[in-house]
């Protein structure tokens, strides 16, 4: 059996003995998980002896004019106190052992000529081009990488994978929802799942993915790994608190490796057994547990392609110097799409970013005033996927815009975890407000936007897409001069019939969603009074026993 180093155990004891805020407790559990995965999936840049050891901060992320294909791409923690890892290490770790998020040690700089060459690529071609910059051929050879990406997008309904819809008065809507679950998360999760399976096959290992969801993440994660022979997925959903469509998308997948539990509680309550399981480092290591959440670097990497595709579709001409700008409006919750846009911007893509949020406005307050603080409660809105208190990917943005200042990033995030409030330093806030502008929309504005878009274009928006389009309407109504603008649409209106009805419109439900109601469903109840943690542990142990005969997965 592989054990934590003494320093790793000392760290965990300190965490256990401290009086922590809920945010710090949650982060500590995730750090313990990162330690375990880093030990079980060692990479060329790490060793078990270095885990838990205080290291010097890494050099700042540099911009590299030319990128050698044979060069290893390393990833460093935003907090600067963890060993660097390669792509495989970042993929399986999620959080770094010091609690930070992984970012590339170097960013390739894309000049005008490269961008002109890329302008003719399909969306899938852009994903391949970007991934080849950040995943070295020593890990996944180029032909294998291309095959994995083709396989990932093979089940998308639209031949372009994503599609730009050009509407009246300069309204461009980039539809990111043509995957199986009608949400943008299909794009990154299907690729991430292919990368996971590639390494698991190579290492002859098996993992169990545990996901707590309020709706979209669970269904997209299930679809990305359903049927995979070396992955089991356990999803806990809040029974009766998802939309009916979201719940059916999870409970009607009857593959042997998919295990769905309906919890008699809310999203916070169902997180408790998951946190308890991941807090047991030995258990996590023994059963190879991981979670496919929005802080995984692989998901951010794939989402960069949204911004490149939006730019190439909307830029008036690429024959000018400098290249013309395009404004990209990003509706966001956890800020993964926003972080992807900031990285693309840093690499040389001439986009202007607008982040659009609902009344859960922590990102808007951060951009406008440098106020990175929690509200008292999460407000329930029509744009439910954006009802988020903590946009964890802002840590990546702070690190990137501060010039890879891991010391500042660490201080900011640790203060935020302790006090749930921090004022962004003046210089960093200035850089943030230069890179990003922001708007916040109430439910009333969302429904008005959905209605107006239908009346002007006969086009149905989901409430999240409406948050972005409302910004476009504001600008055109004020006759503000602007470059071409592209609004990202993260989900289909078909998933949110309640919001469509609230806007006074008629839902348009596709046949495959209607068919869900006629399918057999399977969902194991977790009732009030049951020991949810023990139920989860028992399920994980049973899955490990089933797979031990198929994989050489017994801990040493």
Language-model regions: role of each:
Residues 8, 40-41, 52, 57-556:
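PLP-dependent amino-acid enzyme catalytic core
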Residues 34-40:
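Hydrophobic alpha-helical signal peptides and transmembrane signal-/tail-anchor segments
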